Each structure stands twice: as structure tokens, then as C-alpha cells.
């Protein structure tokens, strides 16, 4: 424990907590401090000027990260007939209808994303208590309820990241791995920030983006200059 504490203190000392860094500087700092024995995730957190308890201040959308996430995403698709075939051809890990409903209802959860064709939502809706708390319920706002299941599967596999504001007014996501190049992480960070700014709700007043922080799994947070956050 002492060694871990010493390492944490050493990492803290490399970051000036009174400063906001450029995206490129922040990426370099975060990567240089990602010294765990595993490939740490690089994570972004954005504090927003919204109160999510109001319907017109909800923030939810999806962004395709240009350099991917570095994670293997398992995709389940609720579809029938030709649409089921299209989903499988696009790389879905499990495809079904009533049979998949029974599996999931029985506790099967070996997937990270759920996609459904519109005609399947009557069935999928009955899984709300199972999928909802895990953030897995398909939603047309983020492109997971769609007749174009093939594209949705490709997006999910290729770096599509859903985000939703939390009670404290924060959105966060993984934007890569420490093993990614600086340029790839920078592209992902900029894409995520842009997507959040575009998702500004009608009820948001004043400054929308209040704070942007980049960190690794075991590292300390590094503040990003809001001028670069396009607020």
C-alpha cells in the first residue's frame, strides 16, 4: 500500500492543478503517468451547466470515435428474418427474437450493446427492468433502435460511444487506451467534446461546458483548456 501511495503522490506532482492544458499537452501528461502493468483506459469527463432533473436539460447522444475505443464490444441484436441475417453478416455476436428475449430474461448478459429493429421494441420493452439499469435499453436517439441494423452493428463494433448526463451534470466516456498514439487519443477527445457540444439541450443556460478533465484508469485528472473545448 505504501508503494501505491508513493506512486500516486509522484503522479500528482507532475500535474499543475492550477493550470488548464491544451488537448495535446493533456494527452502527453496522462499517457506519461499511465504506468500500471495493464493497458490503462484513457477517460474523459465533462462537467456541464445543466440540471438533468429537468427534461429540457437532458444530454444524451452517441459519437463515433475516429480511432475506436480499443475495446472489444459484444453486440446483441433483436431482429428477425432478413434483418437478422444482415446483423449477423455485419458482425453481431448474438442475434434473435423470442429466443433471445428468453435468454436475456433468464439472466444472459454476455454483451455490451443492444440493438433492435423498431418492430422488436414491443418485445424488448418487456426487458426494461433488466436492460434499463445497465444502460443497455435500445433507444432511437442514439441509433440503437433502427431498421439499418447492419450499420448500427458496424458503428458499435467500430467505436460508437453512447453518452448520457449523470445526476451531477457530468458526461464521461473512455476515449482510448494508453497504448494508443497521442494523435489517435487527441482525435477521439476532440470528437467526443464536439459531440457533447452539439448535444446541448434547449434548456441549458449560460456556459454549457464548465470543465473538461482527462485521466487514465490509475492516474490523476488533467484539466483541459476550455477554449479548446469549444464551449
UniProtKB/Swiss-Prot annotation:
Belongs to the universal ribosomal protein uL1 family. This is Large ribosomal subunit protein uL1. GO terms for molecular function: rRNA binding; structural constituent of ribosome; tRNA binding. Keywords: Repressor, Ribonucleoprotein, Ribosomal protein, RNA-binding, rRNA-binding, Translation regulation, tRNA-binding. Pfam families: Ribosomal_L1. HAMAP family: Ribosomal_uL1_B (MF_01318_B). NCBIfam families: rplA_bact. One of its GO terms (biological process) is translation. GO terms for cellular component: cytosolic large ribosomal subunit. It comes from the Bacteria. Binds directly to 23S rRNA. The L1 stalk is quite mobile in the ribosome, and is involved in E site tRNA release. InterPro entries: Ribosom_uL1_bac-type (IPR005878), Ribosomal_uL1 (IPR002143), Ribosomal_uL1-like (IPR023674), Ribosomal_uL1/biogenesis (IPR028364), Ribosomal_uL1_3-a/b-sand (IPR016095), Ribosomal_uL1_CS (IPR023673). Part of the 50S ribosomal subunit. The keyword Ribonucleoprotein applies.
Amino acid at each position: 500500500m505504501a508503494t501505491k501511495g508513493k506512486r500516486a503522490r509522484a503522479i500528482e506532482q507532475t500535474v499543475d492543478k492550477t493550470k488548464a492544458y491544451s488537448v495535446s499537452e493533456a494527452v502527453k501528461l496522462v499517457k506519461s503517468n499511465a504506468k500500471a502493468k495493464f493497458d490503462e483506459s484513457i477517460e474523459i469527463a465533462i462537467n456541464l451547466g445543466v440540471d438533468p432533473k429537468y427534461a429540457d436539460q437532458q444530454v444524451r447522444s452517441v459519437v463515433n470515435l475516429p480511432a475506436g475505443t480499443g475495446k472489444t464490444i459484444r453486440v446483441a441484436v433483436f431482429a428477425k428474418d432478413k434483418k437478422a441475417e444482415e446483423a449477423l453478416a455485419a458482425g453481431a455476436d448474438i442475434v434473435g427474437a423470442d429466443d433471445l428475449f428468453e435468454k436475456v430474461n433468464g439472466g444472459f448478459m454476455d454483451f455490451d450493446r443492444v440493438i433492435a429493429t423498431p418492430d422488436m421494441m414491443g418485445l424488448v420493452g418487456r426487458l426494461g427492468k433488466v436492460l434499463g439499469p445497465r444502460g443497455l435499453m435500445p433507444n432511437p436517439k442514439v441509433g440503437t433502435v433502427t431498421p439499418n441494423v447492419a450499420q448500427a452493428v458496424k458503428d458499435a463494433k467500430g467505436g460508437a460511444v453512447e453518452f448520457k448526463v449523470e445526476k451531477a451534470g457530468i458526461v464521461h466516456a473512455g476515449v482510448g487506451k494508453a497504448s494508443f498514439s497521442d494523435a489517435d487519443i487527441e482525435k477521439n477527445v476532440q470528437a467526443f467534446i464536439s459531440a457533447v457540444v452539439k448535444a446541448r439541450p434547449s434548456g441549458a443556460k449560460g456556459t454549457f461546458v464548465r470543465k473538461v478533465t482527462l485521466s487514465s484508469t490509475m492516474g490523476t485528472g488533467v484539466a483541459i483548456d476550455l477554449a479548446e473545448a469549444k464551449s
